[in-house]
Amino acid sequence: MQNSTVFVLDKNENSREIIKSFIENLDFVNEVKLYDDFTRGYEDIKQSENPIVILDISEDFAGLDEIAGKLKLVTSKIIITSINYSTNTIIKALRLGAKEFLPKPVLREDLVRVLSMLASISPENEVSQSKIITVYSNKGGIGKTTIAVNLAAELAKVTKDKVALVDLNLQLGDISTFLNLNPPFDVNYVIRRLIDKEENILIKGFEKYKDLSLYVLSDPSYIEQSESITTQQITTLFSALKKVFPYIVVDMSSNIDPISLKILDSSDWIMFTTIVNIPAIRNAQRCLNLFRSRKYPSNKVKIVINRYMENDEIKIEDIENTLGESVYWKIPNNYFTIMEAINKGVSISEVNAESNIGNSFRDFAAKVSDDIIEQSVVQYRV
């Protein structure tokens, strides 16, 4: 168990002092620092090694979301408290980055239990609820790279969390081109260093995209390098990424081969992408049968319809009846906005955030984030 400094950010003085009295004599607590000024608290927290934060959200105020977003980039060891413990409040707490939620008045035994649990998590294992979200289609030309790039960018904006965008289309990846990046390292380089236990390569090997908390890992520089990557190395890569990034968005090839199956098997969610035409739907049907044969959980595979038009002859209900699955999301057809974004090497929201497709990707990312939180919220319900 690692010793920690506990930072209590709470507008209520009495509440701050009670929490301090509960925990100041615990063996693993170096110091308890109290703040009613959340901004000043954040400035001290980011200078601390292995901090634990107790953040009260009983009073909503301007800047709370911004402070919480910054805190998530410093530590995942965040406890959120509130006098309101409705389901909506718990969901909000988790969205703000809570590892645990405690209703007020906080009970000493609950607080000590949660602090003990967080103190026992080493920094390299902090991100325990990380999700691998793979965008996949078994047919080329469907637009999965566009979806992966823009979903990852919007997740970084919506959640304020660190998001990894990983190009595992090992022979013909395009993510770096889509975002006009020229990373000094690639996935082949990172995998080789991970084999040698150089886990500090994870951040160094990624290219940060502009001012977002989005980190890009490009495909191998040379096609022949892809041939030496093994399924075990994919497992090693994912295991390492999950220690650093709460969200990992993966783009991959359309192939069905051992590497592809390892990526799909290891993913928490698969954004299975298709378009509205008969050949694409038939291919989707075959692929879904493969997923069923591999015993994927029912909530693992999400159907995403790309280039959707309201006046399509084939309706969403027809697709759902054919595939035997509900459609999770529809991305509208907007060829010119997409091509402008690709040609400029930027995300769609940078071209036209208020276009139909810009709004769609923002709402898509919000839904993904909210649904992941919803999966976790049951354990926090009072």
Predicted region positions:
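Conserved acidic segment of CheY-like receiver
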Residues: N3-S15, I19-I23, V53-I54
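C-terminal output helix
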Residues: V106-V114
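Walker A/P-loop phosphate-binding motif and the immediately C-terminal alpha-helix
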Residues: K131-T177
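Phosphate-binding loop that captures ATP/GTP phosphates
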Residues: V158-V216
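Cytosolic-facing regulatory segments adjacent to core modules
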Residues: L194-I256
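Inter-motif core of Ras-like GTPase G domains
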Residues: P258-N277
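Beta-strand-loop-alpha "switch" segments that mediate conformational coupling across diverse proteins
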Residues: R307, E320-I348, F361
